[in-house]
């Protein structure tokens, strides 16, 4: 069935309210989750929501609480998320990075003891909406084998970058693995195969079975180049921010485990370097030059098209996910009515 964006928000907020999550936090979680579905990152949208519910039940996600700023300078900060919703922690972290960038030109905020935060691009978009460049990286629990290895040591380690422009939505949001783990989980839930050259089974053999891939490892994207980028992110979102790294990272996929991953948020104010109007105009000029070379998409075009289509056509809820959500509602004694679009 298909539901409207407003219906998705209603579902999420009704369930979180019943689980004693404050309204402000529920609003952020719902908005980030909807953003993922609208852009086409369904593996991080409402399909991921039951994992957060399980985290609340197991106590690995705290329904309420405050972040703690452990260290701070004019341009940097280190945040302890105290295991509240990762979406809320990341939102507050980027808010702080933007505030610092407004004063000093650059804001850099590290996060540890948080939780899965949904799509990284939501937070880089926050910077863009404040006429800034946004950069977000994070590590995740082991899923990726290094080149030449069989054992998962690296996470899928996403990176998102958003650039302000006058005419275009400019954003990249991607895992440094050949596939996000969430896409494997989604394929397994739907009983679908995954593409070739994405994953290995537990014996190090190529597989298109998502269940076998989840027991094995995902390949880095782009061979040794993706591996090298993931390697660096593991350090920047691990030791640099006081978070776990490598095989010590837990809780980004298994809601029964406390999350030990790290995040790094950066906001850059172009006005501290160049004239901001000229910067945006030159970004547009570059994009138009790129597009003039042929039938070319820029980073962010697909997401823009998805947003328009899904706002008009709705968001797909597959049967298994629908039953899971209705089951959660029954367990919480909620009379949840889901309106089909």
UniProtKB/Swiss-Prot annotation:
- Which Pfam families does this one have? Ldh_2
GO biological process per UniProt: coenzyme M biosynthetic process
Q: Which domain of life is it from?
A: Archaea
List its EC numbers.
Answer: 1.1.1.337
Question: Which Gene Ontology cellular component annotation is one that this UniProt entry carries?
Answer: cytoplasm
Instruction: Give the pathway.
Output: Cofactor biosynthesis; coenzyme M biosynthesis; sulfoacetaldehyde from phosphoenolpyruvate and sulfite: step 3/4; Cofactor biosynthesis; 5,6,7,8-tetrahydromethanopterin biosynthesis
SUPFAM superfamilies referenced in this protein's UniProt entry, alphabetically:
L-sulfolactate dehydrogenase-like
Record-level Gene Ontology MF annotations: L-2-hydroxycarboxylate dehydrogenase (NAD+) activity
Q: Which UniProt keywords apply?
A: Coenzyme M biosynthesis, Cytoplasm, NAD, Oxidoreductase
Q: Does the keyword rRNA-binding apply?
A: no
Name where it's found: Cytoplasm
Q: Does the keyword Glycoprotein apply?
A: no
The family annotation for this protein states:
Belongs to the LDH2/MDH2 oxidoreductase family.
Describe the task this protein carries out.
Catalyzes the reduction of sulfopyruvate to (R)-sulfolactate. Involved in the biosynthesis of both coenzyme M (with (R)-sulfolactate) and methanopterin (with alpha-ketoglutarate).
**Would you tell me the protein name for this molecule?**
L-sulfolactate dehydrogenase
* Species per Swiss-Prot/TrEMBL record: Methanothermobacter thermautotrophicus (strain ATCC 29096 / DSM 1053 / JCM 10044 / NBRC 100330 / Delta H)
Gene designation: comC
């Amino acid at each position: 069935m298909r539901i409207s964006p407003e219906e998705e928000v209603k579902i999420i907020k009704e369930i979180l309210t019943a689980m004693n999550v404050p309204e402000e936090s529920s609003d952020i979680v719902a908005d980030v989750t909807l953003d993922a579905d609208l852009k086409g990152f369904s593996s991080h949208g409402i399909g991921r929501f039951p994992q957060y519910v399980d985290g609340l039940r197991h106590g690995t996600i705290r329904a309420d609480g405050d972040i703690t700023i452990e260290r701070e300078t004019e341009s940097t900060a280190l945040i302890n998320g105290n295991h509240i919703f990762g979406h809320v922690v990341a939102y507050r972290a980027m808010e702080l990075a933007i505030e610092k960038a407004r004063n000093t030109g650059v804001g850099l905020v590290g996060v540890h003891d948080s939780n899965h935060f949904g799509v990284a691009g939501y937070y880089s978009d926050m910077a863009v909406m404040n006429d800034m460049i946004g950069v977000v990286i994070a590590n995740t629990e082991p899923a990726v084998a290094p080149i030449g290895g069989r054992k998962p040591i690296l996470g899928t380690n996403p990176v998102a970058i958003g650039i302000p422009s006058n005419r275009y939505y400019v954003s990249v949001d991607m895992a440094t693995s050949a596939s996000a783990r969430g896409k494997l989980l989604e394929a397994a839930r739907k009983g679908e195969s995954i593409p070739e050259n994405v994953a290995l089974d537990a014996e190090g053999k190529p597989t298109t079975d998502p269940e076998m891939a989840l027991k094995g490892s995902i390949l880095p994207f782009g061979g040794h180049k993706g591996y090298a980028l993931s390697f660096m992110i593991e350090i920047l979102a691990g030791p640099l921010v006081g978070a776990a790294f490598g095989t010590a990272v837990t809780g980004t996929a298994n809601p029964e485990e406390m999350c030990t991953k790290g995040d790094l948020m950066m906001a850059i104010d172009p006005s501290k370097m160049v004239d901001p109007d000229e910067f945006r105009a030159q970004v547009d000029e570059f994009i138009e030059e790129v597009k003039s070379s042929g039938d070319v998409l820029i980073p962010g075009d697909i997401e823009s098209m998805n947003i328009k289509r899904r706002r008009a056509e709705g968001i797909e809820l597959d049967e298994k996910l629908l039953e899971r959500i209705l089951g959660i509602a029954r367990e919480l004694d909620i009379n949840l009515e889901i309106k089909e679009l």
